[in-house]
Amino acid sequence: MVKAVIFTDFDGTVTLEDSNDYLTDTLGFGKEKRLKVFEGVLDDTKSFRQGFMEMLESIHTPFPECIKILEKKIRLDPGFKDTFEWAQENDVPVIVVSSGMKPIIKVLLTRLVGQESIHKIDIVSNEVEIDAHDQWKIIYKDESPFGHDKSRSIDAYKKKFESTLKAGEQRPVYFYCGDGVSDLSAAKECDLLFAKRGKDLVTYCKKQNVPFHEFDTFKDILASMKQVLAGEKTVAELMEN
């Protein structure tokens, strides 16, 4: 029986830097314009889908080159590997639910958990279309203003997990880990939201009165999840806001 499920964002959550921001800042229209574009997303005058597309369309570097650059530059949260290994030992599924691009996520995540373990992590994300000249564009997962409505993806998984419950069995505890605006819809689908300290998601949660628990690294997340599953603390006790 599955006692808990970890849903997590990827960029800026599993990674210490956001791969899409890095590509935009160094190969696209730069950090200043990116921040300007996302002001509109934060104040709801522009959809995440539109803002993200503007960022990516400013990058003209061939896709394989982008991957090589990211492999050298993007660091991964060292606590994630311990969390993943604990999850494997305790039959806790780990599902990456991302507004980024699957090929990038798969390459970077393989570097962290290893080729033999990557198939144990589900990745639900946008795809990439690459032409004969290695030019590329994002293919959004759905038609929503997010490009990928994470709440829909999470809801589908919840239905799958709960459909196998036997009489009297409790449903799993759903955890979500994130850092940005695109994580808000996902957060509302889960029992406990871990929001990265100092990032947009914390600001947004305070503005929208969404309960959350702040974290710095996955070491904090792992410690809190262990407390909940051991019955030492309730989800409500860990919530802030």
Swiss-Prot record:
GO terms for molecular function: glycerol-1-phosphatase activity; glycerol-3-phosphatase activity; L-phosphoserine phosphatase activity; magnesium ion binding; ribitol-5-phosphatase activity; sorbitol-6-phosphatase activity. It is found in: Cytoplasm; Nucleus. The active site is at residues 9, 11. Mg(2+) binds at residues 9, 11, 179. Keywords: Cytoplasm, Hydrolase, Magnesium, Metal-binding, Nucleus. Its EC number is 3.1.3.50. PANTHER family: PHOSPHORIC MONOESTER HYDROLASE (PTHR28181:SF2), UPF0655 PROTEIN YCR015C (PTHR28181). Present with 12600 molecules/cell in log phase SD medium. This is Polyol phosphate phosphatase PYP1. It comes from Saccharomyces cerevisiae (strain ATCC 204508 / S288c) (Baker's yeast).
